């Protein structure tokens, strides 16, 4: 039975504006992010949705709530959709990470699957928890359309798993704030229909360096 998965990255946060590594830090949406969330909700308003799932972090949850209001639907919070834990990198700017963790940062940019964040997670950790919860979501809503609102790293590892891509190609594509990626799932056969669609944002699209998650 065909199930459609709409993968959404949260709208722009205050720390997306400054480029800080957010990880598990619970940042708010920026003013532009709130506008992005409204445009995203407008884009999805006519789509018949069976359920909306979100990370508990406010930047994702508030994005999902905006979609949910347009759909007249409550949000289902899933802790395993939370962003990667950057550990000691949380709250730092990229140049601060480079000064303190230069060799590890270079490995993160070249071979990200092999990096264990100091005091945090690895991409393998994130992939394990995120793919497990996604399998459960798909099983619970077979034949329907489900929105999953989460974070950059989580979306990248999920898409990598869906298309059979190695985690070391993590930097091969970007996922913008308030973007949509759509996957059709049919009894274990998955098809990526679109990736990082931001046409609904117009001039409100965030143009930032995606390396600071």
List where the protein language model places each region.
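Short active-site segment of divalent metal-dependent hydrolases/proteases
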Residues: 13, 154-155
């Amino acid at each position: 039975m065909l199930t459609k998965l709409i993968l959404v990255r949260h709208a722009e946060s205050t720390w997306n504006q400054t480029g800080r590594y957010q990880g598990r830090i619970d940042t708010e949406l920026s003013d532009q992010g709130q506008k992005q969330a409204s445009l995203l909700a407008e884009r999805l308003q006519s789509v018949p949705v069976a359920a909306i799932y979100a990370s508990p972090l406010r930047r994702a949850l508030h994005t999902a709530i905006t979609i949910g209001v347009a759909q007249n639907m409550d949000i289902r919070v899933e802790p395993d959709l939370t962003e990667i834990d950057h550990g000691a990198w949380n709250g730092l700017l990229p140049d601060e990470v480079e000064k303190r963790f230069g060799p590890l940062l270079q490995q993160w940019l070249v071979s990200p699957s092999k990096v264990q964040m100091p005091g945090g997670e690895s991409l393998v950790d994130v992939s394990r928890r995120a793919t497990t919860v996604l399998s459960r979501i798909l099983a619970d809503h077979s034949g329907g359309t489900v929105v999953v609102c989460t974070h950059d790293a989580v979306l990248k590892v999920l898409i990598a798993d869906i298309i059979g891509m190695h985690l070391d190609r993590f930097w091969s594509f970007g996922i913008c704030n308030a973007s949509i990626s759509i996957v059709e799932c049919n009894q274990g056969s998955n098809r990526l229909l679109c990736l990082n669609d931001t046409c609904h944002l117009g001039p409100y699209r965030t143009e930032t360096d995606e390396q600071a998650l």
